[in-house]
């Protein structure tokens, strides 16, 4: 994350640590699209994953195909009239099957992916990821997929060995990786059930995202590879720039107080962080929900940010997200689309008639979800849904 990188620079400089912090412009989209053609099954899983208000239009945007190719795909599959209609979670598997059976779409996705690979490889090499210097990735986390994709790209470039990653938290791990290369601070796939339940990665991303838009690719300018970023949101940019100045001032003061970095009360700090996050994320005051819930939010490709972090939900929509109602729909026993909020807890406090009841029922849902994930790791539908939202924007 951008703000964590800026704060880390303060600590490195103030404490004269033998480290160099570099910022890598990337996103799940900018890393995955160039690699689609190397594993089309995984690519289809990615573009047909869940999220907030997933539509056919959104799925085709994830594929990276051109506008004309998108229009032809819609026509071939008879989806022109439903392109912007929100899809129930249980429909995503059917959408994937239809796309897999469309040769035109698969070819278009493969060709566009191959074209993007040289620019990704060029950028990673330019930024020094092939250097022999010991290095590691640091990120907010959630699925650990970007580390795997960066390592795949570096392997194409001839790098031996694997980069390790250090994360705020991980809900799950990619398949085919070495567990010892993934390090978690706050929660991990195996531990931290209560922390996960009272945590909102969507709110975390809203507050700590970068002021620039999402990285969508790379282009060469004046002999250098430069990131191509989406336009972002001006309101969000102003908030993040103000937050950056506050955090940097805080980091400066904290760094001055540290006499011996080896004697920091890490466990005490972790407990205090957990206490504060549980309260703010899991049971916010009205003022907190209003301040952070009204930040623009996007969980997908290209920062349209047409919704708020705490989306406005009716009483009926809040109840539809209660444990039993949500599980029935996710399992396919009940039909219909359920409107979700990136930060449900904020929405419940702002718009619910009985926010205490709403928060309790949503916590039950999250407990059941993460418990089922832990004890049924082979259930793909659960793996795909373990999220408030897994936002598309990420930088390292």
Model-derived features with residue positions:
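Long, low-complexity, Lys/Arg-enriched
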Residues: 1-396
